[in-house]
Amino acid sequence: DSQPRDAVQKIGKGLAIGSVILLVAAVGAVALNSYFEEQEKGQSQSGEEYDEYQFAKRQLSETGEAYDEVLTGGYYEVGVHIPEGIYTVEAQDGESAIYLIDDENGIYIWQQIGNDPENPNQAAVMDDLRLYDGALLEVKSGAALQFRSDCAQTERLHGETNPLQDSVRVEVGQTMTAGRDFPEGLYNVKSEPDWNDLMMTLPDSFLSEFAADEERRVEVISFAPKELDLSYENVPIPKGTEIQTTGAAVTLEPSEKIGSTDYGEFYKE
């Protein structure tokens, strides 16, 4: 099985989640945006058009099944949570963004999607989004995004049913530790309707080599009091992670499908 990868930390590798996890830090978004702006600027000055897929090891099939699904904020492993294929992506209402991390094929994409005419970096519709099996797709909180494909490889979907069955509630002011107070694993994080941050303090084994000795890595998922912004899907919570919530109670609901359970790959630099 392919390993999930952390979109935020990939920013530091020349891509730009500078993570869910992020979960993905705001500075990551800025760094990633700046990276791609520089790439596009360099290409335009040389008269060339930047090709995000120039290092892909194979071509995606142009035949397959029709796929039409709405995805909200969260992490989606291609081949597990969404089939491989060539997609058109459109915001239903409002604006959002996607991060695509595909180390196998050298594909790193960050794109804002919405209908703000004053935002030159925002696409109303994103065509030709190529999702290869094993890549990690992150959909940011905001508008729900419609993913459509005429060549989705639905018959190749894999992964296993999540063995976890019980939900976990975390109250404001409470600290809970994965592996002690609840099982580590892959969860959908649901917040009560309020402005809220879920703070995830990762164990020492996930420290950056550049971090000071006393620092521990904290990932943040932010929620807004809007229906579409109250859930983040498929969040890996490794053993030893401390969970706190700042503005409202959250519920950790086991994700339906899981891929790899080696979350070191997800949070790696």
Region annotations inferred by a language model:
Residues Q3-P4, H81, H158:
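Histidine (H) residue identity feature
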Residues D1-L60:
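Gram-positive cell-envelope targeting signals
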Residues G28-A29, Q43-S46, E69, V80-H81, ...:
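Short linear sequence motifs
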Residues T72-G74, V78-I86, Q174, D181-L186:
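A glycine-anchored, Pro-Gly-centered beta-turn/N-cap motif
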Residues N33-Y35, G42, G47-L60, G64-Y67, ...:
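Primarily secretory-pathway and cell-envelope proteins
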Residues M176-L198:
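Surface-exposed interaction/gating patches
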